[in-house]
Amino acid sequence: MESTAPCICKDSNCTKIGPPGYSGILGDKSVEFLRDPAVFVEKYCEHHNSRVFLTRLFMKQTLVIADHKLLTKFLSHSHEHFYNGLQDFSDLFGHNIMFARAEEAANLKRILLPLFGANAVESYQTVLRDVLDDWSRNLDLNNSVNLYEEFKNISLAYNIHIFMGVKKADDEEFFRSIKELSSAHWHGVTSVPWNFSIPFFGNGGYKKAMGAKKKLLKIIVERLSSANSSFFEEFRRKNDGEISQELLYNHMLLFSCALIPKGVGSVLAMFFEMGNKWKHLLSSDGKLSEDDLDCVLLEVIRMFPPFMGGTKVASEDTSVGDYHVPAGTAVYYSFMAAMRDHSAFLYPEEFMPGRWKKVEERKKNLGFGTGLHGCIGRHLTWNCIKEIINYTMDMFTIQFPDKCPPEVKILPVLRPKEPHGFTMIKKYG
C-alpha cells in the first residue's frame, strides 16, 4: 500500500509523499525498540504495510529501512550525505575508518585492504593453527562446552597474535589482561556516552569503558614498540606518512578490541547451534564440502547477522529512495530485517543453505555490510571462521542440540540467549 503521508521535508510546495509512520516528539519508541529491535522492526513493517517507515528513536526523527533492495543501494551511495550515527561513541574507539567521511574513508580503505587481502590472510594461517592447537590441548571435555565463549577467546588470541605480535600460549597473563580490558571497553557501546558518574549511581559504564580504552591504548603502544607485529610494521610502511601516529594506534585498537571476536563468536556459535539443520550435508567422514560450508555459513549470517544493523544521520538535506530526508534525520537500517525481506528471499524464515548455490546470489548477503564502510576485514574474518569450523569438526565429534534455532539476544551482538552446552569428544588421542 502506497503511503499518503506528507513529505517530511516541510516544504509546503513539495509534491512528494512521505514515508508511513509518525515521528512526533511525544512518540519516541526507544524503549520498545531496545526491548527487541527485530520484533520492533517487523511489527511496524506489518503495521504500515511497508518495509520502510518513519518513527522516533532516541529523540531523533528516524527512517527505518528493512527493504533489501533499498538498503543495498543506500549502503552503496549514502557516504556523501550521511555520517555514522555512532559518532557520539567515537571517543570510545578514537577516530578511525568507521567514523571517517567519504574522502578520508576511501583513502584509509585503499591503505588497509591489502593488509587483509588473500595473500595476507594466507600468511596468518600458521598463527591460527597454533592458536587452535593450544585451545584443543587445554579444552576441558569433562564438562559441557560453551562454544560462544570458546570461539570468542580463540578469535581474541588470534587477533592479539596478529596485531600485537603476542602469543597467548607464551603470555597467559597478558591475554587475560587484554580480555578483561576489552570486555570493559566493549560494554561502553551499550552505555550512554557520558564520561562522568551520576551521584548515588556509581561509575557509568561509559566512564569505565573510556578508562579501559586508555589502558588498552597504552598497552598497544608499549607492545608494538617492543613486540614483533609484522601487520603493524606493514601498516606503518604502506601509509607512507599519510596517517598520523594517533590514527595508526586508533586502528590497532579497533582491530585488537572485542568487536571482531564477538562477531566471530556469534557466527560460529549460531553455526553449531543450527547443526541439526545442516548435518544431512555431512559426508561419511563427518565433513562439509567447501561449497556446502560456504552456503551454510551464508545462511547462518543471513538469518542471524552478528550485528543487526546500523545508523547513519543525514548531514544535509538529501533523499533515500522515493523520500526526502532532511538534515539531522537518522536512518536506522536492519540487516536482519532486510535479509528476511520476502521480495528478496524465497521463504525467508526457513533455513535454506541451497539458496546460495549460485555464486551471483551471494552478493545479496549483507552480513559484512557493503559500500565504502563495508567490513575491510571480511576476507580475514571469513577465512578465520571457516578454518575454526574445519579444525573443530576434524578434531571433535560434536553432539548438536535437538532444538533449533535457539532464542537469541540481539544487542549489542547477536548470540544465543541460553548457549547450548555442547558435548564434545576428541577423535584422536
Regions found by a protein language model. Name each.
Residues 2-13, 43, 56-63, 84, 94-130, 139-161, 170-176, ...:
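Cytochrome P450
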Residues 176-243:
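Cytochrome P450 catalytic core segment centered on helix I
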Residues 159, 216, 220, 237-287, ...:
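Central I-helix of cytochrome P450 enzymes
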Residues 80, 333-359:
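Conserved cytochrome P450 K-helix/beta-meander segment immediately N-terminal to the heme-binding cysteine loop
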Residues 2-93, 134, 364:
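N-terminal membrane-proximal hinge/A-helix region immediately C-terminal to the signal-anchor transmembrane segment
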